[in-house]
Design a protein with these regions (language model features):
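Low-complexity, acidic/polar, glycine-enriched regions of mature
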Residues: 1-190
């Protein structure tokens, strides 16, 4: 089992604002795990994000994003992604097809995983690093407010490092994702 390193893992979203380059905000409160099986159907990806943790380094916009006009975190406190189908595309790329639940709406999306590196050992023990992106349309999830300001396309991005916790990942069953403030699990089958 691999636990996400809270120091080296970042979950964020990126969106265009009035035609500017991408503007981003991060979600420091998250949980999740991966089981990656190149030879069978045991692959699984689960990620959950606490929406109230959104942080764009501006208190005014943090409050606005949490409000009913935008993320409505009181009504929709969590965003989650679940996949049981991961298609590997070479040694360092994969696509996890699954369901993204956001703002009370669940839709099929693809989480594109790149720079996947799971060396057998490192100085700190076994690690696994990756970058992942999912492109979604805000309008698909009921976000009509401000489409003219910020555009419709949102890039949800994860840059992560997992640190091995379980000495026997082959036989480990992935538990459901649980949010634990910038911690999570990343499991890999060899």
């Amino acid at each position: 089992m691999y636990g996400l390193d809270p120091v080296n893992t970042r979950i964020s979203f990126n969106i265009r604002y009035f035609g500017t380059p991408w503007v981003s905000a991060r979600f420091p409160d998250f949980g999740g795990q991966f089981v990656l099986d190149r030879h069978g159907a045991a692959s699984r990806v689960d990620v959950s994000i606490q929406m109230a943790s959104v942080d764009c380094h501006d208190s005014y916009w943090n409050d606005r994003l949490r409000s009913p006009d935008w993320l409505d975190v009181q009504r929709y406190p969590q965003m989650s992604f679940h996949s049981e189908h991961v298609e590997f595309q070479g040694s360092d790329r994969a696509v996890a097809s699954g369901e993204l639940n956001l703002h009370g709406i669940t839709r099929q999306v693809e989480l594109e995983i790149s720079q996947l590196s799971c060396p057998a050992a490192s100085a700190a023990g076994d690690t696994c690093s990756f970058v992942a992106h999912a492109l979604v349309k805000r309008s698909d999830y009921g976000f009509a407010h401000g489409l003219w300001i910020g555009g419709n396309q949102v890039d949800i991005a994860i840059s992560g490092v997992g640190v091995r916790r379980d000495a026997s990942p082959r036989n480990a069953e992935a538990p459901p994702a649980q949010s634990t403030s910038a911690t999570g699990n990343l499991t890999r089958l060899r």
